[in-house]
C-alpha cells in the first residue's frame, strides 16, 4: 500500500530514530492541549526537543509558525543540523553503514561492528556528518533504543538484539530536510530559549524524567542528571515565560 503523503509532497515527518520517552503515541493528547488560538501564534519553542514528534507534526500542520528547537544533547542536535544542511551526504553514509552491517551473518560479528563504530565515535572525533550517521546507526541497533553516556560524557550505548535493523529511511530523511528549513536549531541549556518568549509564542516542555528508582536507566541521558532542583528551576522558568505572555 502506498504511504499517504503530505501537501509538501513527502511522507509525514517523524523522528529518524527511536527515542525513549518520545511522544508519537501521545500526539492526539498533546494536540488537544495546544492553545485554542494556535493559528494566531507566530513562534513555537521546544527547549527539550528529543525525538521531536510534536515538532514535526506542528511543522507540517502550521507551516507559518516559526519553530525553535533546543536540546542539551549536542550529538542529537547535530543530527537535526546535518539533516537540514547536508541530507544527501548523510544518506550516502547511512547506506554504506547499512550495507556493511547487513552483510554480517553472526550476531557476534554485528556486535563487534557496533563496538568498533562506538570506539570511532568516542575516540576519533569524526566530522559532523559521520557523527550524525553513527548516531542514527546506534539508536537503531542499540539495546531498546536507549541513549546513554557515562560520567565522562562518552557514548556508552549497549548493543541490542543483533537483528538486521533498518538503518536508512531515505525518503524520511529528505522529508525532514524540507521540514527543518528555516528552523532555529539550538544546543545547550534550555534557558537560552527565553529570548523567544512573547504573547505570540508558545512553549512545549518535555524535560528528562526523574527515575522511578536509583537504577533508572534513563538517568544517563547526559553526564549531569536533571534532578529535583533542576525541575524546580524549570517550574520557575515556566512561570517567568507566563509573565511575558507566552503560552
Residue ranges of predicted features:
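SAM-dependent nucleic-acid methyltransferase catalytic core
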Residues: 2-34, 38-39, 86-219, 233, ...
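Conserved S-adenosyl-L-methionine
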Residues: 40-101
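A short helix->loop->beta-strand "cap" motif at the edges of active sites that frequently abuts
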Residues: 63-65, 243-246
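Localized chelating/binding microdomains
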Residues: 222
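Conserved nucleotide-cofactor-binding alpha/beta core module
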Residues: 225-226
Amino acid at each position: 500500500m502506498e504511504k499517504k503523503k503530505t501537501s509538501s509532497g513527502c511522507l509525514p515527518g517523524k523522528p529518524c530514530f527511536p527515542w525513549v520517552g518520545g511522544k508519537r503515541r501521545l500526539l492526539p493528547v498533546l494536540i488537544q492541549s495546544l492553545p485554542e488560538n494556535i493559528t494566531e501564534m507566530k513562534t513555537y519553542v521546544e527547549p527539550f526537543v528529543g525525538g521531536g514528534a510534536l515538532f514535526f507534526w506542528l511543522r507540517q500542520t502550521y507551516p507559518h509558525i516559526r519553530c525553535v528547537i533546543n536540546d542539551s544533547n549536542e550529538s542529537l542536535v547535530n543530527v537535526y543540523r546535518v539533516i537540514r544542511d547536508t541530507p544527501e551526504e548523510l544518506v550516502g553514509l547511512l547506506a554504506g553503514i547499512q550495507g556493511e552491517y547487513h552483510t554480517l551473518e553472526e550476531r557476534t560479528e554485528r556486535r563487534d561492528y557496533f563496538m568498533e563504530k562506538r570506539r570511532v565515535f568516542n575516540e576519533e572525533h569524526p566530522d559532523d556528518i559521520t557523527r550524525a550517521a553513527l548516531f542514527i546507526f546506534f539508536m537503531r541497533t542499540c539495546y531498546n533504543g536507549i541513549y546513554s553516556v557515562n560520567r565522562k560524557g562518552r557514548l556508552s550505548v549497549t548493543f541490542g538484539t543483533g537483528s538486521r535493523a533498518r538503518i536508512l529511511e531515505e525518503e524520511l530523511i529528505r522529508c525532514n530536510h524540507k521540514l527543518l528549513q528555516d528552523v532555529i536549531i539550538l544546543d545547550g541549556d534550555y534557558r537560552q530559549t527565553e529570548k523567544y518568549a512573547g504573547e505570540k509564542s508558545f512553549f512545549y516542555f518535555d524535560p528528562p524524567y526523574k527515575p522511578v528508582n536509583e537504577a533508572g536507566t534513563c538517568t544517563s541521558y547526559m553526564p549531569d542528571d536533571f534532578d529535583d532542583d533542576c525541575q524546580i528551576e524549570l517550574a520557575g522558568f515556566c512561570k517567568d515565560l507566563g509573565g511575558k505572555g507566552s503560552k
